[in-house]
A protein has these predicted regions:
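Sequence-level preference for short, compositionally simple segments enriched
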Residues: 1-312
Length: 312
């Protein structure tokens, strides 16, 4: 095991230095409490990173989309990450990973985590940001505009990436969980920040590929906020086949009566899949949901267990 500690008691004082030192895999990196102001890139598979304490082991950076870089170009969404993962079989436990750049209306998109890999697991982590906190790669198969995907995986293979987020706290405002992965969120808290607008935000923006069995599944999750009632959507389709499914989730009053938004894409009503089953709380209003939102039967919901997800 490799140890990282800011006080010099470990093998390294920098997380990236520890990652770069790995020569034998699998490997585990243990990070002692502290605030590590750096960007971290994970390229090697079968790596595990474990923090000493989820709230006190903090990786943070403040890159953002509207920042003008040395080449005169804007940073853009996909170069704004704090942690970048382009490896399979990566695990992260008991850490905070944050992008501290600020609200999206001021700085644009600002990713805390860019996760593009198969068999990625985040457990007991806190992912903090504002707009586009967590990108669950891969990217959509086609850009909406030229250069929109500029970043570390713009030319990568568009393949199925399966990811699990368990017992995590994820915070943001607009589209703060987005991408094309099949991602399962189990017992997580999704916290929407108040930007004093209506709508105040969107939790998810899936770009699930056509014919992909799973997009986003939220199981036993808690949707919380400091926003006024009826101001936040559960999601909207970044691409027309986007999927977000909620199973037995707690929805507070900030959730919009309609539940989901169509991103002004009426054609997505027949292709996107937004659904709920056995949800509860002040924001759970099946009778007021948009026409394209489905309420699942018990048999249909049985296809969205973690076991079924892993099988596929």
């Amino acid at each position: 095991m490799i140890t990282v500690a800011q006080d010099g008691s470990g093998t390294f004082t920098s997380i990236q230095e520890a990652v770069d030192s790995v020569t034998m895999l699998p490997e585990t990196i243990y990070i002692k409490n502290g605030i590590y102001h750096e960007r971290v890139k994970i390229k090697a598979p079968f790596l595990t990173i474990i923090g000493e304490d989820a709230e006190q082991t903090v990786l943070e950076y403040d890159e953002y989309a509207n920042k003008i870089l040395e080449d005169g170009e804007k940073c853009g969404t996909f170069r704004s990450y704090t942690m970048l993962i382009t490896a399979d079989n990566f695990t992260c436990k008991n850490m905070t990973i944050a992008n501290t750049a600020g609200f999206g209306k001021e700085v644009g998109q600002a990713l805390a985590v860019y996760a593009e890999g198969d068999h990625i697991l985040f457990s007991g982590c806190r992912l903090l940001g504002h707009q586009d906190t967590l990108f669950t790669g891969p990217l959509p198969k086609e850009e909406a505009k030229a250069g929109g995907f500029k970043g570390p995986t713009e030319f990568a293979e568009r393949r199925l990436c399966r990811q699990i987020y368990e017992n995590c706290y994820i915070e943001g405002e607009v589209d703060f969980i987005f991408g094309s992965a099949a991602a399962y969120f189990d017992n997580c808290t999704l916290y929407s920040l108040n930007r004093n607008m209506d709508p105040n935000g969107y939790v998810t923006a899936p770009s699930t590929y056509e014919n992909q069995k799973y997009g986003y599944v939220f199981h036993n999750c808690h949707f919380k906020s400091n926003c006024p009632d009826n101001t936040v959507y559960l999601g909207r389709p970044w691409r027309n086949y986007g999927q977000t499914v909620l199973i037995h989730c707690e929805l507070d009053g900030h959730i919009k009566d309609e539940g989901f938004h169509d991103w002004n894409k009426p054609e997505a009503h027949d292709t996107a899949f937004f659904a709920e089953y056995d949800c509860y709380g002040k924001g759970c209003k099946p009778e007021l949901r948009a026409d394209f939102v489905k309420q699942l039967s018990a048999d249909e919901a049985a296809e969205y267990t973690l076991e079924k997800f892993k099988e596929n």
